[in-house]
Curated annotation (Swiss-Prot):
PANTHER family linked: CHLOROPLAST PROTEIN-TRANSPORTING ATPASE (PTHR30612:SF0), SECA INNER MEMBRANE COMPONENT OF SEC PROTEIN SECRETION SYSTEM (PTHR30612)
Domain of life of the native organism: Bacteria
Record GO cellular component, one term: cell envelope Sec protein transport complex
Keyword NADP: no
Functional summary from the UniProt entry: Part of the Sec protein translocase complex. Interacts with the SecYEG preprotein conducting channel. Has a central role in coupling the hydrolysis of ATP to the transfer of proteins into and across the cell membrane, serving as an ATP-driven molecular motor driving the stepwise translocation of polypeptide chains across the membrane.
SMART domains the UniProt entry points to: SecA_DEAD, SecA_PP_bind
Gene name of this polypeptide: secA
Catalytic activity: ATP + H2O + cellular proteinSide 1 = ADP + phosphate + cellular proteinSide 2
Cofactor note (record): May bind 1 zinc ion per subunit.
Needed cofactors: Zn(2+)
Name of the molecule in the record: Protein translocase subunit SecA
One Pfam family in the UniProt entry: SecA_SW
Family to which this protein belongs: Belongs to the SecA family.
Membrane topology: Peripheral membrane protein
Length: 902
């Protein structure tokens, strides 16, 4: 053991001693609390709340509050949290991660910090990996909270708005990370305060924290809007790409998950499409179509990265084997896969709101988590979330036996050995859990077992409906269960099946005989651990418990540990082993030459296995290499998203102010916009004789109905300030006229007993709604531009420039441009408010198309669309040399000439 490890372990020991002292304080209050009546126990909640208001802290209340929850759990559920569970609860209250092994009762652990933090009255969120677990945990632990006078809500995907609002208003809310995240995004595209559901992000406990905060960190949550149509192109490229040859027409880098066409490949594609140059400016969208079609063809495999069900493509979570409902690959990849599989293409959507899991959860005032496997990712938790990992001791000693890996030359030989092992274990009655890395492998093994006549269950993304039922029965005698990765995580596998206790089964001589054999075989197992168990449960324990068989090492050691952790719960016996082959992706891609030379030196027969420390070390090194790479990828994603996150915070804060009734200072927007216009046409740095007052009048009319008579100016003595004062005074008068007209018309409608069609009660409300629509529209366009910038920024590295620095700089410029666009759009709108419907569609139409001086003076003939929409940052087709958004794509700009129109 090196010095650093010793120091770290000493630190761990000190932490556990401090936690133990807190546990002793909780236990010291137990006799007093146990003597209270139900009513007196319930009354402690109000007492705690009063003490908080009186200046005491949650830390002051912790020993008493935890003792109260411990007693209520005993009375309502018949479960008394062990000392190690109380210890885990303290860690969660401290905003840290409690690493607790499978079967240690994490669900019960959470009740103590949840209750304590709910006393503050600001809401507590308990985050789970799926809807089933959210509902199960809320119902299971609900009696504790309800006994203590707290309300419990649960969020489910199928819930409507009113149900969600009620669930969030409760003291404690259970739900999935996706539901909490999407509700946050929906709140930030709401158009009235009545549409908000969430309260402040106060305190959250994340169950299976490694799965949610690390494994899903690379997948952003996205709410999308209406699409652009390009289905035919996806099908065309799906037909072209299979005709290309790897190595000649394109190169694939499986490690980096990248693909690149060669010059020869590009020439073939150009010929197939009948175009002279794929990289010509008007064909830039075709390059992305080619890249995504190549990725879909080479890197994404059916029944591994995705499945096809009911004519739709569903992403499969590589870590859990579950279908990621509602998630789609971005940048056209999902559509490329749909075209490859020949199913209907669902059009690309425009991003309306997006946030990464990382940045959503970093917003909580206090964040805690629990899992069975976090130690290997401790650095990442600290770096990204500032969360410390604390390993909690098990209640009973762990006696599972983890066997060395067996490595075969080929997958075929490996699977044959796996099936033989399963058959042998099944015949003696030992339950077997087989872990696979993909749906494809699980179904292949299932077919092999069927040939051998072995009854079994398959748990993968295709059979997720029966997940809890299948996993709960995986510990029955003779059961064989094949599961993709950690499908079924969160559900305990009890030896003998879900009814481990046998429903109060009376013990016989056979029970006694088995109990004696077990205690003789396993000295750490005591009689009280066996009492009350069913005969089947005792038989399974005597057979060695659950046997976990991994068919491939995962990229992350943590996922392997999770699989192993399904066995040996609460001091039960268990066994685990991984079967590998040199053809496995991990060994093939990351094992390097060492593995190849080892294989050649040993000269293995196909059906022979090696079981050597050298192989295990090579596997560990390969896993560490991948873990490091994945951490760097997540870290880089976060660095880029942090740029957008700061901008998001600004925009969402503005929206929230508008939404909550903050009065809009319209005149300040008018002053900013018109001052900018005046500085371009009548600058104080230019002689008045050189001012373009005619051009100024025309430009001002694009923003408001200008009535300034510039001919009255004495041009020789005029100043820029004088011009500014004239314009702003006129603009102020026109705004007041608009306001007066509005109020007059509204009053007239009221006199007639009518209501406004747009539902706006006052000009103030109209100002708020208009600004909100403009902010949303411009933010959507900005998200598109930032995504466009992000996709191409990597090439800056070739010019010896740091892509991240460039992204920050250009992202800031785009944000400043967006802010100016918001001001200009708002001013244009507010002066014409009586003539326009206040909808986001109209705001977008104004932003992207243009028109005359008045929005209702549009050309009567419809504008033609070419196949491709002109991007805001592309050169304007009119030939001016300016970006499109600065020229004919600008608010109020005249339409392009017919031959060039969009």
């Amino acid at each position: 053991m090196n010095l650093l490890t010793k120091i770290l372990r000493m630190g761990e020991g000190r932490k556990l001693k401090a936690l133990q002292r807190t546990v002793e304080e909780v236990s010291a209050r137990e006799p007093e609390v146990r003597g209270l009546s139900d009513a007196a126990l319930r009354a402690r909640t109000d007492e705690f709340k009063e003490r908080l208001q009186g200046g005491e802290t949650l830390d002051d209340l912790l020993p008493e509050a935890f003792a109260v929850v411990r007693e209520v759990a005993r009375r309502t559920l018949g479960l008394r949290p062990f000392d190690v569970q109380v210890m885990g609860g303290v860690v969660l209250h401290q905003g840290k991660i409690a690493e607790m092994k499978t079967g240690e009762g994490k669900t019960l652990v959470a009740t103590m910090p949840v209750y304590l933090n709910a006393l503050a009255g600001r809401g507590v969120h308990v985050v789970t990996v799926n809807d089933y677990l959210a509902r199960r945990d809320a119902e299971w632990m609900g009696p504790i909270y309800e006994f203590l006078g707290l309300e419990v809500g649960v969020i489910q995907e199928s819930m409507g708005f009113e149900e969600r609002k009620k669930a969030y208003a409760a003291d404690i809310t259970y739900g999935t990370n996706a539901q909490f995240g999407f509700d946050y995004l929906r709140d930030n595209i709401a158009t009235s305060p009545d549409q908000l559901v969430q309260r402040e992000l106060h305190y959250a406990i994340v169950d299976e924290v490694d799965s949610i905060l690390i494994d899903e960190a690379r997948t952003p949550l996205i709410i999308s809007g209406l699409p652009e149509s390009a289905a035919d192109l996806y099908y065309r490229f799906a037909a072209i790409v299979p005709r290309l040859r790897e190595g000649e027409d394109y190169e694939v880098d499986e490690k980096k998950r990248q693909v690149a066409p060669t010059e020869q490949g590009v020439a073939k594609v150009e010929k197939a499409l009948g175009i002279p140059n794929l990289y010509d400016g008007v064909n830039t969208n075709l390059v992305n179509h080619l890249i995504q079609a190549l990725r879909a063809h080479t890197l994404f495999r059916r029944d591994r990265e995705y499945i096809v069900r009911d004519g739709q493509v569903f992403i499969v979570d590589e870590f859990t084997g579950r279908v990621l409902e509602g998630r789609r690959y971005s940048e056209g990849l999902h559509q490329a896969i749909e075209a490859k599989e020949g199913v209907e293409i669902k059009e690309e959507n425009q991003t309306v709101a997006t946030i990464t899991i990382q940045n959503y959860f970093r917003q909580y005032e206090k964040l805690a988590g629990m899992t069975g496997t976090a130690a290997t990712e401790a650095d990442e938790f600290m770096h990204t979330y500032k969360m410390e990992v604390v390993s909690i001791p098990t209640h009973r000693p762990m006696i599972r036996v983890d066997r060395d890996d067996l490595v075969y030359r080929t997958k075929k030989a490996k699977y044959a050995a796996v099936i033989d092992d399963i058959v042998e274990r099944h015949r003696k009655g030992q339950p077997v859990l087989v872990g696979t890395v993909s749906v494809e492998v699980s179904e292949h093994l299932s077919a092999l077992l069927k040939r051998r006549g072995i009854k079994h269950n398959v748990l993968n993304a295709k059979h997720h409906e029966r997940e809890a039922e299948i996993i709960a029965e995986a510990g029955k005698k003779g059961a064989v269960t094949i599961a993709t990765n950690m499908a079924g995580r969160g559900t305990d596998i009890k030896l003998g099946g879900s009814d481990e206790s046998g429903g109060g089964e009376e013990w016989t001589e056979e029970h006694e005989r088995l109990a004696s054999e077990i205690m003789e075989k396993y000295p750490t197992i005591t009689r009280d651990m066996l009492e009350g168990r069913s005969l089947e449960s005792l038989e399974v324990v005597n057979l060695g418990g659950l046997y976990v068989l991994g068919t491939e090492r995962h990229e992350a050691r943590r996922i392997d540990n999770q699989l192993r952790g399904r066995s040996g719960r609460q001091g039960d016996p268990g066994e685990s082993r991984f079967y590998l082959s040199f053809e496995d992706d991990l060994l093939r891609l990351f094992g390097g030459q060492r593995m190849q030379s080892l294989m050649e030196r040993i000269g293995l027969e196909e059906d022979e296995a090696i079981e050597a420390g050298m192989v295990s070390n090579s596997v560990r090194r390969a896993q560490e290499q991948v873990e490091s790479r994945n951490f760097q990828m997540r870290k880089r994603i976060l660095e880029y998203d942090d740029v957008l996150n700061k901008q998001r915070e600004v925009i969402y804060a503005i929206r929230r102010e508008i939404l909550m009734g903050e009065k809009v200072d319209t005149m300040s927007y008018v002053e900013d916009v018109l001052t900018d216009v005046i500085s371009r046409y009548a600058s104080e740095d230019v002689y008045p004789e050189e001012w373009d007052l005619e051009g100024l009048a025309t430009e001002l009319n694009r923003f408001y109905p200008c009535q300034v008579d510039f001919s009255s100016l004495d041009i020789e003595s005029a100043t820029a300030d004088q011009v500014r004062e004239m314009v702003l005074e006129d603009a102020r008068e026109r705004l007041e006229e608009r306001r007066a007209e509005w109020e007059e018309r509204t009053a007239e409608l009221e006199r007639r007993g009518l209501a406004r069609a747009d539902g706006l009660d006052s000009f103030e409300e109209a100002e708020r709604r208009t600004l909100l629509s403009v902010v949303d529209s411009r933010w959507r366009e900005h998200l598109y531009e930032m995504e466009y910038l992000r996709e191409g920024i990597g090439w800056r590295g070739l010019g010896q420039r740091d892509p991240l620095v460039e992204y920050k700089r250009e992202g800031y410029d785009l944000f400043v441009e967006m802010e100016r666009g918001i001001r200009e759009d708002y001013v244009t709108y507010i002066y014409r408010i009586e003539n326009l419907k206040l909808s986001e569609t109209d705001v977008e139409r104004l932003s992207y198309s243009g028109g005359g001086e008045e929005p209702n003076q549009r050309p009567k003939s419809p504008r033609r669309r070419s196949e491709r929409k002109i991007g805001p940052n592309e050169p304007c087709p009119c030939g001016s040399g300016k970006k499109f958004k600065k020229c004919h794509g600008r608010v109020g700009a005249p339409p392009l000439p017919t031959s060039q129109s969009q």
